[in-house]
Regions:
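Pocket-lining segment of extracytoplasmic ligand-binding domains
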Residues: 186-187, 192-281, 404-416, 420-422
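Short, glycine-/small- and polar/acidic-enriched structural segments
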Residues: 29-180, 185-188, 204, 233
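Beta-edge loop/turn motif
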Residues: 387-399
Length: 486
């Protein structure tokens, strides 16, 4: 992979960082010193939980905070300050009430620009989670709405939290299609207000960030018609710190990132249990947490600051600047990877290898219905039995066969997951459209029905048209599964 010149300048040897940290650490702070650390979190933004609520509930930050050298006998006062969106966190950082914050890509740009403009500089020090193609942000409509794709929203009243990652996604969607800003009647509404207004039919659609484009359909009153994966541009959530705090207490920033890395490992080690705990702590349903952070999840947990993420942030800034939505911002010096590099080094991890990796947590295991292992994770599925475990399946057809088999046994399906054939993101099976049927190379019907899931109705229609199948609902796809499928 070719690394841009500015990214190469970030590749500071870990040894130099350690020397710098040790030199900075000379001289104790004093036995009576109390270091106050304000951490701005977004508990209900599911792809940030390993940077916030998980650290808080498992005590991981306390585990790694430095207590030797200049920090000997120092006391720490942690203030966890939660918000449902990024602007209050940026305000808190500008007021120096929050020293460490987490937010999505477009809010990160606003945070960095505001800091530079007000002389309260921040720095991007780590990533929490990403989707390399933009998945996670989305637009939903009422479940019984006649709208099925973005083009249907022309002239309609659509809400989104202004300044959010979802807002950025919607701006990008218009630019990609050459559409003007007044294509729709766009208004700013928080997730809570937008959700209520959608249920009460006061708006035609609502755009939002993680987890709302999955959460609202899961709760039964919405349907997703657009996912950020359609932009094919990365989306991410990252960690920013006040620059003065990082300069004064670099060891604390490194400790935070080490805690983040352990939280990521905890989430991956037993994703079902982790999702259940996150539901307990945040009230976001475990099945929704799992679709983002479990195997095959929409987002990948990885703190490394990859060159392609920097390129994406530069493109985000350019898009906002063209629309005069953000002030001048010098992005390159705002990115500081020395802390995450040092955290990797202290944990014995290979940062350079992680920079090159886009590996997530693929679906794997043995399919109990079709009696074969999962060989192609991008075509696999999963079923979460209510009160039970999560079972992998080798294909969408085998997953739906599993739904029928488990239901026949009297087991209640908490959630079934399939992979979108076009966008590559995980879907709730009952929210997908399906192309079923199909013909072989000789034009004859296949011996067993092909069942291919899609988020978007028009993608399913196109696939069915091109492969001699038909568009089907979830119920129709279930009915098409033969009882002897193995």
């Amino acid at each position: 992979m070719r690394v841009p010149a500015y990214a190469k300048r970030l590749l500071i040897p870990v040894a130099l960082l350690i020397v710098g940290a040790v030199a900075f650490g000379a001289g104790p702070l004093g036995a009576t010193t109390t270091i106050e650390i304000g951490i701005g979190t977004q508990h209900t933004t599911t792809n940030t939980v390993t940077g916030g609520i998980v650290l808080k509930e498992l005590g991981l930050l306390e585990k790694y905070l430095p207590r030797t050298g200049k920090y000997k006998d120092v006391k720490y006062s942690l203030s966890w300050q939660n918000s449902t969106s990024a602007p209050p966190l940026t305000n808190g950082m500008m007021a120096n009430n929050i020293q460490i914050g987490m937010m999505g890509d477009y809010p990160l740009i606003y945070n960095g620009a505001t800091g530079q403009q007000t002389k309260n500089e921040t720095q991007l020090v780590a990533i929490i989670a990403y989707n390399a193609f933009g998945g996670g942000n989305g637009i939903v409509v009422a479940k019984d709405s006649p709208y099925y794709e973005l083009a249907d929203l022309k002239g309609k009243k659509v809400s989104v939290p202004f300044g959010s990652a979802a807002h950025g996604m919607m701006l990008q969607a218009l630019q990609d299609r050459g559409l003007p800003p007044d294509f729709w009647d766009l208004v700013s509404q928080s997730p809570e207000v937008g959700s209520t207004n959608l249920q009460e039919k006061r708006i035609d659609a609502h755009g939002d960030f993680v987890p709302y484009a999955e959460l609202l359909p899961f709760r039964g009153f919405a349907r997703k018609i657009y996912d950020g994966a359609e932009t094919r541009r990365p989306t991410l959530h990252g960690v920013v710190v006040r620059k003065d705090f990082g300069e004064k207490y670099p060891e604390i920033v490194v400790a935070y990132i080490k805690a983040l890395i352990e939280a990521n490992d905890w989430m991956r080690k037993n994703p079902r249990v982790a999702a259940e705990k996150v539901e307990e702590w945040t009230k976001i349903e475990k099945e929704v947490v799992y679709i983002f952070l479990g195997p095959g999840g929409v987002h990948t947990l990885d703190p490394s600051i990859k060159p392609q993420w920097l390129s994406a942030l530069e493109a985000d800034y350019a898009a906002l600047r063209r629309l005069n939505l953000v002030k001048d911002f010098d992005l390159r010096p705002w990115v500081n990877d020395k802390f995450v590099r040092q955290a990797f080094g202290e944990l014995g991890l290979d940062y350079e290898a992680q920079l090159e990796s886009l590996a997530g947590s693929p679906i794997q295991g043995m399919d109990p219905i079709c009696k074969q292992p999962v060989r192609v994770p991008a075509e696999a599925g999963q079923i979460w039995i209510e009160g039970g475990d999560v079972t992998p399946f080798s294909s969408a057809a085998c997953t739906l066969a599993g739904v029928k088999a488990f239901s026949a046994e009297g087991k209640k399906i908490g959630a079934a997951y399939v992979m979108d054939h076009a966008l590559g993101i995980q879907l709730f099976a009952d929210a997908a459209f399906y192309a079923i049927g199909g013909t072989d190379s000789a034009g004859k019907p296949t011996a067993r029905p092909e069942i291919v899931p899609f988020l978007l109705k028009h993608d399913a229609e196109q696939y069915a048209r091109e492969h001699g199948g038909k568009l089907s609902s979830y119920a129709e796809a279930l009915s098409a599964i033969p009882s002897d499928l193995r």
